[in-house]
């Protein structure tokens, strides 16, 4: 392994990665430094040392095998390659304002774990490059209290950020090497304020930890979209959406309302419904209504001739010649033609 060293004025950041050449690329104000094989310099301790220089005020991107690491710092970064157990690559990043180092371990399957902070597990296909974005903690003063936030994003995976600055990470993980993929969404409890309903699938497990986060495990893969405080699952290729947020039904959705009535009629209908429900509960009237009240009246109504829209003719309209049924007039005309012929 090789050791890459760069000194900084105030603090020193240490990241353990694999050796490589130094290539700088300018992409949207971010300096990309790729480590590959290059000329080496021997230090006094006998180790091989190389220096990485970065322009002040620009973040540094160090490409690691299988992923990329971005830190928002303008100081030169010290990269040291140290062999880990079982062929692992260990990366240690000190966080300003806190004590200790954040250690990121890259194992061959692609799992990434941050000790003392958030944990991210990445399972990607072979040949695909995963990108890990780690920003320095941003200190925000709210109501006299200092809060430290850190955003971790994985390119190629699914990440969403809430309006409060919290990060929702969707982590697809293979289960026992099978084709079935399960995803885990970590949602801060602060972003779940208000009356909300989370509709999940049959195999969805929802747990709540003591750290103020809610974890939802899904049996499918998809994208997490955060729009206006709403959490949705956008289906990917060949997948079915498993989680969505639906509004709570109001009082008007629980009871069917009659249409096209005024306020007086509406209140009267409600009173009749309450009175009928009370009588049905007491057993005084049957719960099922008959189709018609009197059979004789029903037969008479069915035998009566109706006009347009099912309206009954009045006796005067029925006797008038211009209100005669057109079908009956056609039948009489055909009868006259037959008689003449």
UniProtKB/Swiss-Prot annotation:
Subcellular location: Nucleus
Modified residues (Phosphoserine): 320
Family annotation (InterPro entries): CCAAT-binding_factor_CS, NFYA
Superkingdom, taxonomy of origin: Eukaryota
GO molecular function list: DNA binding; DNA-binding transcription activator activity, RNA polymerase II-specific; DNA-binding transcription factor activity; DNA-binding transcription factor activity, RNA polymerase II-specific; RNA polymerase II cis-regulatory region sequence-specific DNA binding; sequence-specific DNA binding; transcription coregulator binding
GO cellular component term of the entry, any: CCAAT-binding factor complex
Compositional bias segments (type: Basic residues): 294-304
Motif interval(s): Subunit association domain (SAD): 260-283
Name of the protein in question: Nuclear transcription factor Y subunit alpha
Protein's job: Component of the sequence-specific heterotrimeric transcription factor (NF-Y) which specifically recognizes a 5'-CCAAT-3' box motif found in the promoters of its target genes. NF-Y can function as both an activator and a repressor, depending on its interacting cofactors. NF-YA positively regulates the transcription of the core clock component BMAL1.
Alphabetically ordered keywords of this record: Activator, Biological rhythms, DNA-binding, Nucleus, Phosphoprotein, Transcription, Transcription regulation
Family named by the database record: Belongs to the NFYA/HAP2 subunit family.
Predominant cellular place of this UniProt entry's protein: nucleus
Self-association and partners: Heterotrimeric transcription factor composed of three components, NF-YA, NF-YB and NF-YC. NF-YB and NF-YC must interact and dimerize for NF-YA association and DNA binding. Interacts with SP1; the interaction is inhibited by glycosylation of SP1. Interacts (via N-terminus) with ZHX2 (via homeobox domain). Interacts with ZFX3. Interacts with ZHX1.
Source species: Rattus norvegicus (Rat)
Stretches for region Disordered: 294-341
Coiled-coil ranges (or none): none
PANTHER family on file: TRANSCRIPTION FACTOR NF-Y ALPHA-RELATED
Single Gene Ontology BP annotation: transcription by RNA polymerase II
Composition bias type Basic and acidic residues, residue spans: 305-322
Entry-linked Pfam families: CBFB_NFYA
Residue ranges for the DNA-binding region feature of this UniProt entry: 290-315
